[in-house]
């Protein structure tokens, strides 16, 4: 938008901030013409009209339709092998702890959409890894054996194969939960969609156990934990074999070893910033392996539209 009246600068900025932080959050472009930029206006201009208070208002949260919510919860209650895939919408709604609690309380394995904001620390018990069969191969087992995939705060884009098989099997029920209608429109491929603030949905889901409506045991969760451990152990063993062979042949350090060494030198107060093709690829793998061994980092920044 372009500000065409200097007396309405306050109004335009207030509206831009509201648009940027509500619904489907994101950047808003606001132009200020040079003639207005170099003009002067009274400090109180615009305050004679509502809203009289220019303080930031609480962010509006989408509350789920009871009937639609009940349909999703019924699917979850009847599921034997559910999976949660979290995206940047969880981060925008400050619902990371709600996500972790749902996974822990209900024994549901949690995955992160690749190139989206990291939601949970790699050391979190319910977090398995990326929903990516290349950077985290055990996710293939989880997705291909699942009967319900709950995609919360994410888009069914190329990272998730647009929700299509073979990434998410045809036999699996695919549900998308988003905090804005704009995001839901991008997820038309879902079998079922729910307009809801991610935190509200995750809390309601988590409360199923407290209300004695959740019967899923720990077998499915433990299967995924076992697959993760097997992958970590095999990856480290293969790396050890390759390192020994490299020493004999005068080869160079493996990029996975380099990534692990970098993180080994870091503390829980350090941020890891990764970028660039193979560096990013191997670092993502190393992050999961190191996290499985108890490594904690303050945070991770990486390339991607939703990071």
Feature map (PLM): residue ranges:
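Anionic-ligand anchoring segments at beta-strand to alpha-helix junctions in alpha/beta enzyme folds, i.e.
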Residues: 64, 76-149, 265-307
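Phosphate/pyrophosphate-binding active-site segments
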Residues: 74, 175-276
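Gly-rich Lys/Arg/Thr-decorated short loops/hinges at beta-loop-alpha junctions or inter-strand turns
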Residues: 45-57, 121-122, 232-246, 293-298
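Short internal beta-strands
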Residues: 31, 108-114, 175-178
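Conserved thiamine diphosphate
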Residues: 1-23, 60, 145-146, 191-193, ...
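Phosphate/diphosphate-binding loops
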Residues: 132-184
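Short beta-strand segments
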Residues: 4, 29-33, 85, 151-153, ...
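Conformationally flexible catalytic loops at phosphate/diphosphate-handling active centers
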Residues: 15, 19-78
């Amino acid at each position: 938008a372009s500000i065409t009246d200097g007396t309405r600068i306050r109004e335009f900025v207030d509206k831009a901030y509201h648009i940027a932080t509500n619904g489907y959050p994101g950047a808003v472009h606001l132009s200020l013409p040079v003639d207005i930029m170099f003009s002067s206006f009274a400090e109180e201009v615009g305050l004679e009209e509502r809203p009289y208070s220019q303080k930031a208002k609480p962010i509006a949260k989408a509350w789920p339709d009871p009937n639609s919510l009940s349909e999703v919860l019924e699917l979850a209650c009847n599921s034997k092998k559910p999976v949660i895939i979290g995206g940047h919408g969880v981060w925008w709604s400050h619902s990371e702890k709600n996500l972790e609690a749902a996974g822990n309380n209900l024994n549901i394995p949690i995955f992160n959409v690749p190139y989206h904001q990291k939601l949970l620390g790699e050391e979190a018990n319910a977090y398995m890894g990326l929903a990516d069969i290349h950077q985290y191969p055990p996710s293939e087992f989880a997705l291909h054996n699942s009967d319900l995939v709950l995609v919360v705060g994410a888009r069914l884009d190329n990272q998730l194969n647009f929700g299509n098989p073979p990434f998410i099997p045809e036999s699996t029920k695919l549900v998308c939960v988003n905090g804005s209608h704009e995001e839901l429109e991008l997820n038309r491929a879902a079998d079922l969609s729910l307009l809801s603030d991610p935190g509200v949905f995750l809390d309601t889901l988590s409360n199923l156990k407290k209300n004695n409506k959740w019967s899923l045991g720990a077998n499915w969760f433990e299967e995924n934990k076992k697959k993760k451990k097997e992958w970590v152990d095999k990856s480290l063993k293969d790396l050890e074999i390759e390192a020994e062979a490299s020493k004999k042949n005068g080869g160079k350090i493996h990029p996975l070893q380099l990534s692990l060494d970098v993180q080994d030198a870091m503390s829980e107060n350090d941020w890891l910033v990764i970028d660039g093709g193979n560096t990013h690829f191997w670092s993502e793998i190393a992050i999961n392996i190191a996290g499985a061994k108890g490594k904690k980092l303050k945070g991770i920044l990486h390339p991607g539209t939703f990071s």
